[in-house]
């Protein structure tokens, strides 16, 4: 019997190359006893009395941390409901070779007639403050507005009466259900 548990496709979080183009070892190369650099960040939040308050997690590669942090800040600091926190627009900052870029992901807006997620249109339609976008661009940040696959955050929240409330990001195929 092996102790531990499987972390789904975590092997793919290792670097696919063991050395760089100059022959130098890559720190994130697979090796016995190593764990990969990973962005998996399922989070469990407890209240000050140590009781379960909520849990949040999302798919999304190295954007997972931002998705999960956004929901935690939204609920704890801003007092949002689980669904309001899941629906917030996402702002993902990246830097490579000293050059930064910011990707903004549309708020999950569902067309009530077609039940489709609307992902195109002016940034303001998606809950992104156009003044903040303009300010970031004026500072030299490369802003891209994502229309593709984005956050799929799910939240389970414990209400004061002990019942549970769930939320799922409308931008992906997830949903909330109850099993009795």
Q: Model regions: which residues?
A:
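Proteins synthesized as precursors that undergo proteolytic processing into mature forms
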Residues: 1-134, 138-146
């Amino acid at each position: 019997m092996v102790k531990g548990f499987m972390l789904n496709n975590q092997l793919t979080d290792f670097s696919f190359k063991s050395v760089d183009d100059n022959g130098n070892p890559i720190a994130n190369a697979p090796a016995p006893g190593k764990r990969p650099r990973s962005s998996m960040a399922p989070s469990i939040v407890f209240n000050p009395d140590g009781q379960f308050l909520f849990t949040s997690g999302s798919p999304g590669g190295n954007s997972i941390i931002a998705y999960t942090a956004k929901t935690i800040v939204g609920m704890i600091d801003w007092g949002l409901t689980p669904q309001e926190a899941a629906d917030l627009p996402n702002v993902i900052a990246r830097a490579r070779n000293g050059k930064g870029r910011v990707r903004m992901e549309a708020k999950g807006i569902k067309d009530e007639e077609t039940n489709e997620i609307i992902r195109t249109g002016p940034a303001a339609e998606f809950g992104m403050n156009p003044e903040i976008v303009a300010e970031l661009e004026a500072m030299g940040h490369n802003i891209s507005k994502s229309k593709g696959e984005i956050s799929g955050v799910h939240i389970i929240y414990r209400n004061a009466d002990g019942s549970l409330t769930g939320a799922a990001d409308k931008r992906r195929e997830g949903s909330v259900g109850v099993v009795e």
